[in-house]
Amino acid sequence: MQKRCGWVKMNNPLYIAYHDEEWGRPLHDDQALFELLCLETYQAGLSWETVLNKRQAFREAFHDYHLQGVADMTDEELEALLDNPAIIRNRAKIFATRANAQAFLQVQAEFGSFDTYLWSFVEGKTINNDVPDYSQAPAKTTLSETLSKDLKKRGFKFTGPVAVLSYLQAAGLVNDHENDCEWKSRNE
């Protein structure tokens, strides 16, 4: 049996696939980075499992996370999403998705890509942490606090240091797979 991080819910195939195929792998595609940022914002106050279970519905609701399409969504379109039972119907999070798309586009214009901007915070290299037990890992770090402040300054919403650390881990900038997880070395 393969050894995974202790946080993986082994009774949920979406969770297992997310850990095995996505979490912690260095991500450099701007559209994928945007989708992941949105998913992390939806998680605030909820379980990651809830977000994963609604992921496809979010894609459908937000134009497959095509940046310009999301940035151009009208208030009426966003309000209509509040009636969609397939997604998390939190008004602030729904409207934050559009605001984050607009801020994301501004970062792309300034840096050439969001990828260039984001990875500059780790000098282009994944930080590999010593994590014997993920439950003992910090909820935020100096890096996540620094990036959070910069994102907020640029107009991003729901990007506090805890959500940002989760984003950095998921996007592979920080490798926090547990030391005995078989995926730790695959992402170094």
Predicted regions, residues:
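HhH-family (HhH-GPD) DNA N-glycosylase catalytic core used in base-excision repair
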Residues: 1-188
